[in-house]
Amino acid sequence: MWNVGARYGWILTAPHGPGFLRGQFEYAVDVVPVFLVVQRTGTAYGFGLNPFALKWNFTKPRKVVPYFELGGGTLFTNDYVPPGTSHVNFTSSGALGLHFLRSKYNWSAEIRFMHISNAGLASLNPGINTLQLRLGFGRFAHSN
């Protein structure tokens, strides 16, 4: 499985919480225009939209910021994923990651568990579970 996407997020809260748990909630939307699923029957090409990602960014560290995230969305593919099921699937995921902050831009690295399932749209619904390493490049915009 391989994918490329873009994310836009909004910080929802001011920092709060005690000690090392101090952080803030972020809501994000992912658009994944390139989603490849390599299967025994061939490669399925798809598009993903994840309108729900809720993330807790820890705010105590300054240059390396850990986070965890829960999210979900929809995956549309040109072939059945898994084979014999559906062209439309739903995704749910959880991730642990780090933002490496610089003055203007940042890098991110995360480990993500993702479940892909058609939620009963087809009579066959075996689902796929994946563990992914994701790398990202971005910019945090600050509003004043």
Put a short name on every predicted segment.
Residues Q39-T41, N78-G84, A119-N125:
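Extracellular loop and loop/strand-boundary signature of outer-membrane beta-barrel proteins
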Residues I128-N144:
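Outer-membrane beta-barrel "beta-signal"
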Residues G23-V31, P66-G72, W107-I111, L131-L135:
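Transmembrane beta-strands of outer-membrane beta-barrel proteins
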Residues V31-V37, G72-N78, F100, F113-S117, ...:
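Transmembrane beta-strands of outer-membrane beta-barrel pores
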Residues L12-F25, T59-V65, L101-W107, H142-N144:
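Short loop/turn motifs that connect adjacent beta-strands in outer-membrane beta-barrel proteins
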Residues M1-P51:
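Glycine- and aromatic-enriched membrane insertion/assembly motifs of diderm outer-membrane
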Residues A6, F52-L54, F68, G94-L96, ...:
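Membrane-embedded beta-strands of outer-membrane beta-barrel proteins
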Residues M1-V4, T43-N50, V64, S86-S92, ...:
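Residues that define the transmembrane beta-barrel architecture of outer-membrane proteins
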